[in-house]
Amino acid sequence: MSLTAQDLRLVKSQRTLLDIPQLQLAAGRLHALLGPNGAGKSTLLGALAGLEHSVLRQVRLLGQPLSHWDTLDLARARALLPQDNPVPFDFNVRDIVRMGRYPHSDQPHPREAHLVDDALQMAGALHLVHQRYELLSGGEKARVHLARVLAQVWAHPDHPQERWLLLDEPTAALDLAHQHTVMRLLRELTQQGVGVIAVLHDINLAGAYADQVLVMNQGRIDTMGACEQVLQPSLVERVWGVVCERLPRHDREGRGWLAFS
């Protein structure tokens, strides 16, 4: 199955924010969304998540327009991790992650009591479970919110369905080690059938882990396809205005590496 969009055009204050004639993203794959600041990446992610009510009919999940989805059913099928996740009250980490389980209140998982810890473990943040959220570092907060969205789409064994994670810069606040830990986790989730769309700014990080990259520019998808085909110096210079060269990399997948001047 897939997450699709048709004639996705979003205009606000006479400014075209999105103009995407057609888009089809397969589940079970890691899709990296790249592009310069202001290209429309976060706007597209929000539209695909159902946050832009004017284009709900143009986006389909499991073959159904988002406008036809029940709110709780949609929350169980997809989770959005925005760039900013303000928490106005003094919650502890367990409380934050437990919020992701709210859509499942009417059909709790057999392991419901353990899912918060399971999600924190996957996000590399279990040791923070009893900490006050406001005392965490930026990177620790990012991993806690990643655990929250993991908990949100945790599938019920009696109600299996396609699941999607829509992540806006999930690695931005993380150190080098945690960036790669999170990207490996996302790859593992795709092997379980989860569809992942991640906005990234590190082109080499996208090239190392993504199955497909989508390069946006001025509200449009400039180029999309396999990493080794799309991430070429000519595209980087045209879209970002940065000169680079592609270095060979002899791994099992034959992925290359971009070196910047």
Task: Provide a role label for each language-model segment.
Residues 232-233, 237-261:
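ABC ATPase nucleotide-binding domains
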